[in-house]
C-alpha cells in the first residue's frame, strides 16, 4: 500500500500518469477478483484474459464483453462489475479529488489547474465542492432510475432479484456503461417494445452524457438565460444529435426486415430513438447490431465518434469537440478567421486541440480496424464499428469481440483503456505544452493547402 501511495503522490509523477496508473490498478484488481471461483455461478476460475477484458470494459464504462455477464457471473461477480462501473463512471477527476480528501492531502495549484482543464471549467475554486455535488447528483438520479425500472423488473423477477436488476441497469445506464444482466445475451431486445424501460434507460444515458459541469451550471443558475455558453451549446447539441440520429436510423432501417422493417411506425420510432441515444455512448441495444445496414453502421460510427460531453460518463471525441469542428468548418467556408459561438470567440489553441483529438480518433480507429480486419478476416465495416465502439467506450458489438483472436482481444482492451483514460490525459498534456510555449512567436509563412 505504501508503494502505491508513493507512486501516486510522487512529486515527479504528473497528474496524467497518476490517473492512468490508478485506472490500470483498479482494472487489474478487478480482474483478479473476477477470476475467483466465487465470482462465477459455476464456481470455476475465470480465464485471466476474459476477466481482464470484462473489468477493463466495466471500469472504462464501455460494455463490450466476451462473457454473458448475467448468465456467467454470480451475484458477487456482478457486484464487482457494478462497483467498477460506478467507479469508472464517476470519472478520474472525482476519483482524484476523493483520494486527496480521504488521504487528508491538500490539492495543490497545479493539480487544481489540471483537474479544472479536464473538467472544462475555467475556475480553480470549488473543485472539491463539485466532486461532492457529483456524488450526490449521481446517487439521486440512479436511485430514481432504479425506482422506475423496478415497476417492470420486480413483478417479473420478484422483489430482491427485480430490485437488483433495477439498480444494476440504472447505474449502468447513467454511467453510460451498457452492461446488462438479463442473462439471455440479447441486452434490451426483450424490452424493445416497452417504452417505460427503453425511455427510462435513454433518459439516464442522456443525462449521464451531459457532464458534471452542465449539471452544476443548471443547478446553480436555474434559468436557461443565465447558463454559460458551454452549457447551452452542450444541451442543444445533445438534443440535436438525438433527434437527427433518430431520424437517420428511422430512414435507413425503415425497410430492413431484420431490424424494424416489420414493426409499427410507433415501434420503429421508439427503436430508432433508443438506437440513436445508446450509439453515442451507452451500448445497450434493442436491435441486433449485425443486422443493421452498412449505411446504419457507418452512421453509428459517426455517432460513436461524437460521443457525449466533456466531464461526463461518455466517450468519443466529445460533444464540444464535434460542435467546435463543425463551427470551424463553417467559419472557413465563410472566409472568416475566427470561430464565434454565442457571441464568444473561441481561442485558436482550443481549436487546435479539437482538431488534434479528431484526427487522433480517426487515425487510431482506422488503423486498429485495418489490423483486425486483416488478422481476423473480418469485414472492414464490422471492424470499424467494433473498434469505434471500444475506443469511444460505447459497447455496441457486431460480434467481432466474441469471435476475436487473442491479439484482437488485447488490442480492444488497449483501445477501451485509452478511450477512457488516454484521450483525456492526452488533452491535458496537450494543453499544458501549449501554455508552456505560447510566449514564443515565430515569423509567419504562407503554406499551400488544398
Regions from the language model: what does each represent?
Residues 1-450:
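Membrane-proximal intracellular helices of multi-pass ion channels
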Amino acid at each position: 500500500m505504501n508503494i502505491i501511495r508513493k507512486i501516486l503522490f510522487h512529486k515527479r509523477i504528473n497528474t496524467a500518469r497518476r490517473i492512468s496508473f490508478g485506472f490500470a490498478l483498479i482494472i487489474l484488481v478487478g480482474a483478479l477478483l473476477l477470476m475467483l471461483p466465487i465470482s462465477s455461478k459455476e464456481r470455476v476460475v475465470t480465464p485471466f484474459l476474459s476477466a481482464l477484458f470484462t473489468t477493463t470494459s466495466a471500469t472504462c464504462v464501455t460494455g463490450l464483453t466476451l462473457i454473458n455477464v448475467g448468465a456467467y457471473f454470480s451475484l458477487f461477480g456482478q457486484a464487482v462489475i457494478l462497483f467498477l462501473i460506478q467507479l469508472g463512471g464517476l470519472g478520474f477527476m472525482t476519483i482524484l479529488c476523493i483520494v486527496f480528501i480521504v488521504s487528508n492531502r491538500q490539492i495543490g495549484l497545479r493539480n487544481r489547474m489540471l483537474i479544472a482543464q479536464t473538467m472544462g471549467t475555467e475556475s480553480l475554486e470549488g473543485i472539491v465542492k463539485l466532486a461532492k455535488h457529483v456524488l450526490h447528483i449521481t446517487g439521486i438520479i440512479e436511485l430514481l432510475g432504479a425506482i422506475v425500472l423496478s415497476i417492470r423488473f420486480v413483478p417479473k423477477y420478484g422483489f430482491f432479484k427485480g430490485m437488483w436488476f433495477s439498480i444494476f441497469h440504472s447505474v449502468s445506464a447513467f454511467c453510460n456503461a451498457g452492461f446488462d444482466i438479463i442473462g439471455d445475451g440479447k441486452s434490451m431486445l426483450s424490452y424493445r417494445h416497452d417504452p417505460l424501460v427503453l425511455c427510462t434507460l435513454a433518459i439516464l444515458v442522456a443525462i449521464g452524457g451531459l457532464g458534471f459541469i452542465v449539471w452544476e451550471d443548471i443547478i446553480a443558475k436555474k434559468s436557461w438565460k443565465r447558463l454559460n455558453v458551454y452549457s447551452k451549446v452542450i444541451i442543444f447539441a445533445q438534443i440535436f444529435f438525438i433527434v437527427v440520429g433518430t431520424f437517420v436510423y428511422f430512414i435507413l432501417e425503415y425497410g430492413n426486415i431484420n431490424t424494424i422493417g416489420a414493426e409499427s411506425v410507433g415501434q420503429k420510432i421508439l427503436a430508432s430513438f433508443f438506437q440513436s441515444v445508446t450509439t453515442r455512448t451507452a451500448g445497450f441495444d434493442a436491435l441486433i447490431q449485425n443486422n443493421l445496414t452498412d449505411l446504419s453502421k457507418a452512421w453509428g460510427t459517426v455517432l460513436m465518434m461524437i460521443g457525449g460531453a466533456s466531464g461526463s460518463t461518455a466517450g468519443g471525441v466529445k460533444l464540444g469537440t464535434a460542435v467546435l469542428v463543425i463551427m470551424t468548418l463553417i467559419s472557413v467556408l465563410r472566409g472568416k478567421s475566427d470561430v464565434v459561438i454565442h457571441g464568444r470567440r473561441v481561442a485558436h489553441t482550443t481549436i487546435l486541440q479539437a482538431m488534434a483529438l479528431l484526427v487522433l480518433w480517426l487515425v487510431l480507429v482506422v488503423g486498429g480496424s485495418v489490423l483486425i480486419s486483416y488478422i481476423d478476416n473480418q469485414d472492414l465495416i464490422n471492424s470499424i464499428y467494433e473498434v469505434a465502439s471500444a475506443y469511444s467506450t460505447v459497447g455496441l458489438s457486431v460480434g467481432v469481440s466474441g469471435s476475436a483472436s487473442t491479439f484482437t482481444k488485447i488490442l480492444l482492451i488497449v483501445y477501451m483503456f485509452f478511450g477512457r483514460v488516454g484521450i483525456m490525459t492526452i488533452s491535458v498534456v496537450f494543453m499544458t505544452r501549449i501554455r508552456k510555449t505560447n510566449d514564443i512567436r515565430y515569423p509567419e509563412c504562407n503554406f499551400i493547402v488544398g
